[in-house]
């Protein structure tokens, strides 16, 4: 029984599915997808649960969410292993994901009060009050790269605001989704407040097509995000929050501290085997001897990176990609760029055929035309050389995406220029592109999102503002508007 609907675990009636470890092929999870009728049933359960949940005092909702945080802490080792085995990422990195899930609770509570709490301004004849109200029933679509943390960033603020939810994890990480939902069940969520539907494209389409949804919160690829945007066009009554990918530039202007610059680049491009939406995809390196030396050192150090199993000892820096198919897609993208005229600096290699273990690849594309403006979700770094900083910014902005951008330089003025001219939601200076703070908004512009950033700003799309002018008494104004006559006439 792999679906959780209205507080009950039930068996899916859709397609049979199984999940294996992307390196060992060990079967980790088996179950059936939710069919369209079960998706509709989950929505009905969420709708029925909404009035009571929305009317619960905030303190009651907070108590359940904090109980969930305590359960995450108590079961950290178990959830870490589930995430690591299912995604292929090393145990150390999966542990940081669970820590981020735990930290998200306190941050979301603070964000709720800071961004969507109640504010009152006293007036001469009453008060002006700003309150926030939940949307109702929301669908949450989760990605596979951070199958615990990223859905958590939607689910927690949505529940705190008083919404009820239908959660569809990625079909590539059903085990993590199920494990997390079982902790929510133990936290004491009332039946119907949070529902789990497993499945792939058909389940997702059934969910996003429901007329009774009040909104949809999505983290994933730009292609799927665009499909959802088209599907919900003409429905302004529904909130739609899209957190999509990026073709992110990292500018290396000054690499005098060579190894520090190389370390920052490795963290930006290859952590999580390149499967972070903020990963550097385009490396812009200044022309000259220093840039040449930097690239040589980068290729040297990156060439020593050996991906390994989730439980290897010692732990590797990177593990496997989500699937062998994903690794093959990266290889095909590299070959395509070679065919366009790219010069390979570091050849990506499959460690073992049939697995998702893939070494990093680096290819220079200076002067190459018709390079696809796409997010290759894996350890492939494209290099361009530039002559002056204005050219670097032009290259950085030469993309339909706009998620993250970074600069390695000692010149504050260059960073200030980048802040003014970069088209990206995250702009970092001498910090990895993959570094982000939950106390700041997380999101981008262009093909990277629809101006609904998450993290600290997730509270914004989980509730709508209600403005009130209020007074306990009804009084006639001392001064009336022109043309109004309230004088009493004597009866004739």
UniProtKB/Swiss-Prot annotation:
Pfam families: Aldedh
Keyword Oxidoreductase: yes
Catalytic activity: N-succinyl-L-glutamate 5-semialdehyde + NAD(+) + H2O = N-succinyl-L-glutamate + NADH + 2 H(+)
GO molecular function, one term: succinylglutamate-semialdehyde dehydrogenase activity
HAMAP family per the UniProt record, alphabetical: Aldedh_AstD (MF_01174)
Similarity comment: family membership: Belongs to the aldehyde dehydrogenase family. AstD subfamily.
Name listed for the protein in its UniProt record: N-succinylglutamate 5-semialdehyde dehydrogenase
Source organism of this protein record: Salmonella schwarzengrund (strain CVM19633)
Gene name for this UniProt entry: astD
């Amino acid at each position: 029984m792999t679906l959780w609907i209205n507080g009950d675990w039930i068996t899916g009636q859709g397609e049979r599915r199984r999940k294996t470890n992307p390196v060992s092929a060990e079967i980790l999870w088996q179950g059936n997808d939710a069919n369209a009728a079960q998706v509709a049933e989950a929505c009905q359960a969420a709708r029925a649960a909404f009035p009571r949940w929305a009317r619960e005092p905030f303190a009651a909702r907070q108590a359940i969410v904090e109980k969930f945080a305590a359960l995450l802490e108590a079961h950290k080792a178990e959830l870490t292993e589930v995430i690591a085995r299912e995604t292929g990422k090393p145990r150390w990195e999966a542990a940081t994901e669970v820590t981020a899930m735990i930290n998200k609770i306190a941050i979301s509570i603070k964000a709720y009060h800071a961004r969507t709490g109640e504010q009152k301004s006293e007036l001469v004849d009453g008060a002006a009050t700003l309150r926030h109200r939940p949307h109702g029933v929301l669908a949450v679509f989760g990605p596979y790269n951070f199958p615990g943390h990223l859905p958590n960033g939607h689910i927690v603020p949505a529940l705190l605001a008083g919404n009820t939810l239908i959660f569809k994890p990625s079909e590539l990480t059903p085990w993590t989704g199920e494990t997390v939902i079982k902790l929510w069940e133990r936290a004491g969520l009332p039946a119907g407040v949070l529902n789990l539907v497993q499945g792939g494209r058909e389940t997702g389409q059934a969910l996003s097509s429901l007329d009774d949804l009040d909104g949809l919160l999505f983290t994933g690829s730009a292609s799927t995000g665009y499909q959802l945007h088209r599907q919900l066009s003409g429905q302004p009554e529904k909130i739609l929050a899209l957190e999509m990918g990026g073709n992110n530039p990292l500018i290396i202007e000054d690499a005098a501290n060579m190894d520090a610059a190389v370390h920052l680049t490795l963290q930006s491009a290859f952590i999580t085997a390149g499967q972070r939406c903020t990963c550097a995809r385009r490396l812009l390196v200044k022309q000259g001897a220093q840039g040449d030396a930097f690239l040589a050192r980068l290729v040297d150090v990156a060439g020593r990176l050996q991906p390994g199993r989730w439980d290897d000892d010692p732990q590797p820096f990177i593990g496997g990609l989500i699937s062998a198919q994903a690794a093959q897609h990266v290889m095909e993208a590299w070959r395509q760029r070679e065919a366009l005229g790219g010069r390979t600096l570091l050849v990506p290699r499959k460690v073992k055929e049939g697995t998702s273990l893939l070494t990093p690849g680096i290819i220079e594309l200076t002067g190459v035309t018709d390079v696809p403006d796409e997010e290759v979700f894996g350890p492939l770094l494209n290099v361009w050389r530039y002559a002056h900083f204005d050219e670097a910014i032009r290259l950085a902005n030469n993309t339909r995406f706009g998620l993250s951008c970074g600069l390695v330089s000692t010149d504050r003025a260059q960073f200030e220029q980048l802040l003014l001219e970069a088209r990206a939601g995250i702009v970092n200076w001498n910090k990895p592109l993959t570094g982000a703070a939950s106390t700041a908004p997380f999101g981008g512009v262009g093909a990277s999102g629809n101006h609904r950033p998450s993290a600290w700003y997730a509270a914004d799309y989980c509730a709508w503002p209600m403005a009130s002018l209020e007074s306990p008494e009804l009084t006639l104004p001392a001064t009336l508007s022109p043309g109004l006559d309230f004088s009493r006439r004597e009866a004739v």
